[in-house]
């Protein structure tokens, strides 16, 4: 009863307080509510009398979709280009298409038809998402397969179905930790899919908007002048409180000092010689402060250049000491924006290039011993584990350190390409090197175990070609021809095989080995029962990839015929050159 009394008392007090309010307010509120109810009921009754299919819909207005803009096609473009553009825009819904005609680029452009013969037209397109790009790439592959009866070369396209072997590899890689060169490129699946269609030299790149902005492939396929005009600087909010202020006195001072050091280095590269090396070194040391990583790197470049010209002014141990001074600098250690793992990788590559420049001053074993000690010491400054074998240039330089050349005129792919540009014009001379066969075998096995350990993976073509040229200049012709046959069999396109035949003839002529030339022209040149140049030349409709390539082969064959005119195979080569 007491509890009930308390509850009843509370209810009575609430009722009294409620009715103690002004009567006018209560009646006004009740009247407004009643009016609204009557109005709503009237509207409901009116709407109920109208059939549902005649009532006005209260939906949002329909937005008009923007039409996809189709870019203009280049003049004299093939019909297949129009088909791919229509397919990408109308069927797949890709946007922001750009078409690049590589025949319009200047001859010295790295993507011009004079420099490469695989790409004629490049299409860039943006997808809405990674799933959209994957679906478009999947449909594009099926279209090319059924229309042109071959499978295109597609890279960057990955689905959710991963094999057990791949999962084990990924798990093993996770346990090792990310390499120092790890980046976001390639991690996001289907953010960049490249498709070599194999049709009229058309290459298609499908990218997400973020990846397209970060890669800026337009710069790669555009003329440099056009790219500079279209380059836009980021907008700056001029209403900001600190607009126009510099980062600070120390930063501006470091930039000014770096410019001074860069000018000294550029002056030495242009005007420096054996006698003025000491003067440039003293001027550089006078302005060197060591307040930034860039200053130490510029000092390394200058000292390395001086060492090549006058080794008495700058010795090899001084160049190595520059690197250790950079990592022991307290001023640099306090700068948190420095990525030391990246610096370690760059310095390792630069040190290996310096060892290559030493040439015959040290033997290959001495150079590799120096490199081993350098890597052991510099990796102590790394915050994370670094896998140098993931860097292609590291493997190439590692192989390069297995041999030395006294006259520094060794041949490689770049030299042979330059000879083709000069239409076969080269200075006569014997190209021989001193190759450590045991070291070469160990380095080859080291690369295979650390980077190419999978049964499905082999040495890339550029590395196999580098090794092949090494064996040829070292006089190891059995290993040369074995690698040569392996490379020739791996080339599926006829135009690639034609180029390989031309550079082989140039290489053997430059090395000037009579037995090797006789082996080429008697066994492979016009072999009716196997691979031969004549067969590939006929299959390619008696065409070369460029006129420079044709003239280079013609001039080399004429030189071989004149030098070995007593040999039947040399005379046949000269007769073939007369018809080119």
Swiss-Prot record:
GO terms for biological process: mitochondrial gene expression; mRNA stabilization. Keywords: Membrane, Mitochondrion, Mitochondrion inner membrane, Transit peptide. It is a peripheral membrane protein. Residues 1-38 form a transit peptide. It is found in: Mitochondrion inner membrane. SUPFAM superfamilies: Nucleotidyltransferase. One of its GO terms (cellular component) is mitochondrial inner membrane. It comes from the Eukaryota. Coiled coil: none annotated. The keyword Manganese does not apply. PANTHER family: ATPASE SYNTHESIS PROTEIN 25, MITOCHONDRIAL. Probable mitochondrial mRNA stabilization factor. Belongs to the ATP25 family. This is ATPase synthesis protein 25, mitochondrial.
């Amino acid at each position: 009863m007491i509890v009930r009394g308390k509850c009843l008392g509370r209810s009575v007090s609430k009722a009294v307080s409620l009715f103690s309010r002004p009567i006018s307010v209560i009646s006004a509120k009740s009247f407004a509510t009643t009016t609204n109810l009557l109005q709503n009921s009237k509207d409901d009754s009116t709407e109920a009398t109208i059939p549902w299919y005649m009532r006005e819909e209260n939906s949002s207005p329909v937005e008009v979709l923007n039409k996809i803009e189709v870019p203009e096609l280049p003049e004299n473009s093939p019909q297949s280009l129009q088909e791919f553009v229509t397919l990408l825009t109308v069927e797949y819904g890709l946007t922001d298409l750009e078409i690049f005609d590589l025949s319009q680029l200047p001859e010295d452009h790295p993507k011009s038809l004079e420099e490469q013969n695989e790409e004629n037209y490049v299409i860039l397109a943006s997808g809405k998402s990674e799933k959209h790009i994957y679906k478009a790439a999947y449909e594009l592959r099926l279209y090319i397969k059924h229309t042109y009866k071959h499978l295109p070369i597609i890279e960057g396209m990955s689905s959710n179905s991963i094999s057990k072997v791949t999962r084990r590899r990924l798990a093993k890689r996770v346990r090792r930790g990310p390499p120092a060169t790890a980046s976001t490129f390639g991690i996001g699946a289907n953010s960049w899919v490249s498709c070599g269609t194999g049709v009229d030299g058309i290459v298609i790149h499908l990218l997400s908007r973020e990846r397209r902005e970060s890669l800026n492939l337009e710069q790669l396929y555009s003329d440099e002048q056009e790219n500079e005009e279209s380059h836009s600087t980021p907008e700056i909010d001029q209403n900001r409180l600190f607009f126009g202020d510099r980062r600070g006195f120390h930063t501006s001072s470091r930039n000014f000092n770096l410019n001074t050091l860069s000018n000294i280095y550029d002056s030495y590269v242009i005007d420096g010689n054996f006698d003025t090396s000491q003067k440039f070194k003293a001027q550089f040391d006078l302005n060197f402060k060591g307040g930034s990583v860039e200053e130490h790197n510029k000092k390394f470049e200058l000292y390395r250049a001086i060492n090549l010209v006058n080794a008495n002014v700058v010795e090899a141990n001084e160049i190595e000491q520059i690197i250790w001074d950079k990592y022991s600098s307290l001023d640099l250690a306090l700068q948190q924006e420095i990525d030391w793992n990246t610096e370690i990788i760059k310095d390792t590559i630069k040190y290996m290039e310096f060892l290559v420049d030493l040439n015959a001053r040290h033997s290959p074993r001495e150079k590799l011993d120096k490199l081993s000690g350098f890597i052991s010491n510099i990796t102590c400054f790394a915050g994370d584990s670094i896998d140098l074998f993931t860097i292609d240039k590291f493997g190439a330089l590692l192989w390069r350190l297995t041999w030395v050349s006294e006259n520094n005129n060794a041949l490689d792919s770049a030299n042979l390409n330059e000879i083709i540009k000069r239409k076969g014009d080269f200075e006569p001379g014997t190209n021989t090197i001193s190759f450590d066969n045991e070291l070469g075998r160990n380095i080859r096995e080291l690369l295979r175990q650390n980077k190419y350990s999978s049964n499905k993976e082999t040495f890339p073509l550029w590395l196999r070609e580098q090794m092949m040229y090494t064996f040829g200049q070292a006089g190891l012709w059995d290993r040369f021809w074995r690698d040569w046959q392996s490379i020739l069999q791996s080339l599926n396109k006829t135009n690639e095989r034609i180029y390989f035949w031309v550079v082989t003839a140039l290489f053997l002529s430059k090395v000037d080995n009579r037995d090797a030339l006789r082996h080429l022209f008697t066994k492979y040149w016009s072999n009716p029962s196997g691979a031969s140049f004549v067969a590939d030349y006929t299959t390619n409709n008696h065409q070369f990839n460029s006129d420079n390539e044709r003239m280079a082969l013609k001039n080399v064959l004429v030189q071989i015929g004149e030098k070995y005119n007593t040999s039947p195979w040399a005379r046949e080569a000269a007769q073939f050159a007369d018809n080119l």
